[in-house]
């Protein structure tokens, strides 16, 4: 038997006393009263903040949304299947935030900014709050630089500027995502960081978008935030704010960003589900009273920053799905009133083969020609006017058979202009190509062609001008104006190609 001497015992006790740490930890804890449907009710947690993160015993994280007199309503950021009644919950003292860094470019992440593309961890030294205040009035300046989508119909008649919020609205399967992804593809070489947020989409649809961006080299400057249809409602509700926080990180570093929310109807549905389960009073269409604030605080974060803050910008393209063209439903009207214009995609036009199926009549950009280069303003005015007159005449022509020659000519011109606006998916055009295309149509060069020949001719014309008249593109890109010299080069090129084309067609 080992015997300890008295001085050894006193040494051990002295060491233990020296090692004793007097730190007192006060942990704000509570007990689970009820759990289910992605919601937990907690008793205790007396000093919890609204929106604070709480941690359950088995590791699930939740957000305290309802602070009631005798319990706290928490939404879970996981399935919560292992949470039991009576288990303990502790407040973390933190509001939801995500790590941010340049390393996120080219990655696919979830609403908590964790990678889901199987390519390992993402290193980040900084973090940002998911919900941060939007820039104030003094921090902004008016939108003046164009953000080209590569789609003639949008860039000429519904122009989008850097820092603008433009809603893309339409029924299901009308090409809303296609317009958004084409815009991302067109930012190649424009020094714009793109963030694509997929909310409640099918995983196969998200994979398709990611693949198409990868094939065309667009993932290099793009971040995809995805919460698919099987994700908890809490994460679908948070995904847009995560995307906005990432875009803001780049915006405040003097860069230009484009963020696409696809789509906000699904986010509103996820928020409605959470609110009803938390027993908040339902309003119109069973949405909670603060569903307007849900979207307004998100979209107000898009801005063109002032020169003091570095002139960075964040352009938002929210997408909203309508039911059988009903633009006057609750969520569409809310988002229309928050944004700076809308691009309306029509199922009838889509089915008639007019793609992109943009209804130019009811689409609008509230920034307007401030977001266009001078050369585009010069050619787009005539296009708008002629298409508006054509739409009016077309409706009238259905009732009248004997039309005079001038009316017939105007109808023929309108049909060719409508043909000129058609574009294949994933084939965005540069602004110089758009200007030459519109100029060809509005100045009557297409009037002598059959409608079926228009697109074929325009494709050949673009190739011909690129190889034989490169000075046209050089003048437009350097001066941003359709000068007399550029116009004469363009006229010459169109005439030459038209003669060649008509000869080919005769053979």
Curated annotation (Swiss-Prot):
Membrane protein topology class: Peripheral membrane protein
GO-annotated cellular components: chloroplast thylakoid membrane; proton-transporting ATP synthase complex
Catalytic activity, reaction form: ATP + H2O + 4 H(+)(in) = ADP + phosphate + 5 H(+)(out)
Site (Required for activity) location in chain: 363
Amino-acid positions noted as binding ATP in the UniProt annotation, renumbered to this chain: 170-177
Enzyme class: translocase
Subcellular location: Plastid, Chloroplast thylakoid membrane
Residue(s) carrying Phosphothreonine: 257
SUPFAM superfamilies for the chain: C-terminal domain of alpha and beta subunits of F1 ATP synthase, N-terminal domain of alpha and beta subunits of F1 ATP synthase, P-loop containing nucleoside triphosphate hydrolases
Domain of life of the organism encoding this protein: Eukaryota
Keywords assigned: ATP synthesis, ATP-binding, CF(1), Chloroplast, Hydrogen ion transport, Ion transport, Membrane, Nucleotide-binding, Phosphoprotein, Plastid, Thylakoid, Translocase, Transport
Listed GO MF terms: ADP binding; ATP binding; proton-transporting ATP synthase activity, rotational mechanism
Pfam families assigned to the protein according to its UniProt record, in alphabetical order: ATP-synt_ab (PF00006), ATP-synt_ab_C (PF00306), ATP-synt_ab_N (PF02874)
E.C. number: 7.1.2.2
Assembly mode: F-type ATPases have 2 components, CF(1) - the catalytic core - and CF(0) - the membrane proton channel. CF(1) has five subunits: alpha(3), beta(3), gamma(1), delta(1), epsilon(1). CF(0) has four main subunits: a, b, b' and c.
Physiological role: Produces ATP from ADP in the presence of a proton gradient across the membrane. The alpha chain is a regulatory subunit.
Family from the record: Belongs to the ATPase alpha/beta chains family.
HAMAP family: ATP_synth_alpha_bact (MF_01346)
Record-given protein name: ATP synthase subunit alpha, chloroplastic
Organism of derivation: Aethionema grandiflorum
């Amino acid at each position: 038997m080992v015997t300890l001497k008295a001085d050894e015992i006193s040494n051990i006790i002295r060491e233990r006393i020296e090692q004793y740490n007097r730190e007192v930890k006060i942990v704000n804890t509570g007990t689970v009263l009820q759990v289910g449907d992605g919601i937990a009710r907690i008793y205790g947690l007396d000093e919890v903040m609204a929106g604070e993160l709480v941690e359950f015993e088995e590791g699930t994280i939740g957000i305290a949304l309802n602070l009631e007199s005798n319990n706290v309503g928490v939404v879970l950021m996981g399935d919560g299947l292992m949470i039991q009644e009576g288990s303990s919950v502790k407040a973390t003292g933190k509001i939801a935030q995500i790590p941010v860094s340049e390393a996120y470019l080219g990655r696919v992440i979830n609403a908590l900014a964790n990678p889901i593309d199987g390519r390992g961890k993402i290193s980040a030294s900084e973090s940002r709050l998911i919900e941060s205040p939007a820039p104030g009035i003094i921090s902004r300046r008016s939108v003046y630089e164009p953000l080209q989508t590569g789609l003639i119909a949008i860039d000429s008649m519904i122009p989008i500027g850097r820092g603008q919020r433009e809603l893309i609205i339409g029924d299901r399967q009308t090409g809303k995502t296609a317009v958004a992804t084409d815009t991302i593809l067109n930012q190649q070489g424009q020094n714009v960081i793109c963030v694509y947020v997929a909310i409640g989409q099918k995983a196969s649809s998200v994979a398709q978008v990611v693949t198409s961006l990868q094939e065309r080299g667009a993932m290099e400057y793009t971040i995809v935030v995805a919460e698919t249809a099987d994700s908890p409602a809490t994460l679908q509700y948070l995904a847009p704010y995560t995307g906005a926080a990432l875009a803001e990180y780049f915006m405040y570093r003097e860069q230009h960003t484009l963020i696409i929310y696809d789509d906000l109807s699904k986010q509103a549905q996820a928020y409605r589900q959470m609110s009803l389960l938390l027993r908040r009073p339902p309003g119109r269409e069973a949405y909670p009273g603060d569903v307007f604030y849900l979207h307004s605080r998100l979209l107000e974060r898009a801005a063109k920053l002032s020169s003091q803050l570095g002139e960075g910008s964040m352009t938002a393209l929210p997408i909203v799905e309508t039911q059988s063209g009903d633009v006057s439903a609750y969520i569409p009207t809310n988002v229309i009133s928050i944004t700076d214009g809308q691009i309306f995609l029509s199922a009838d036009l889509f089915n008639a083969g007019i793609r992109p199926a943009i209804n130019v009549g009811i689409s609008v950009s509230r920034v307007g020609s401030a977001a266009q280069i001078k050369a585009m303003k010069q050619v787009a005015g005539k296009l708008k006017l002629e298409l508006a007159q054509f739409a009016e005449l077309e409706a009238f022509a259905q009732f009248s058979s004997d039309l005079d020659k001038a009316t017939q000519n105007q109808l023929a011109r309108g049909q060719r202009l409508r043909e000129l606006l058609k574009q294949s998916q994933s084939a965005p055009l540069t602004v110089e190509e758009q200007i030459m295309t519109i100029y060809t149509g509005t100045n009557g060069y297409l009037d002598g062609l059959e409608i079926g020949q228009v697109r074929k001719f325009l494709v050949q014309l673009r190739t011909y001008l690129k190889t034989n008249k490169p000075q046209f593109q050089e003048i437009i890109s350097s001066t941003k104006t359709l000068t007399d010299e550029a116009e004469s080069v363009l006229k010459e090129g169109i005439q030459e190609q038209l003669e060649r084309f008509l000869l080919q067609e005769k053979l």
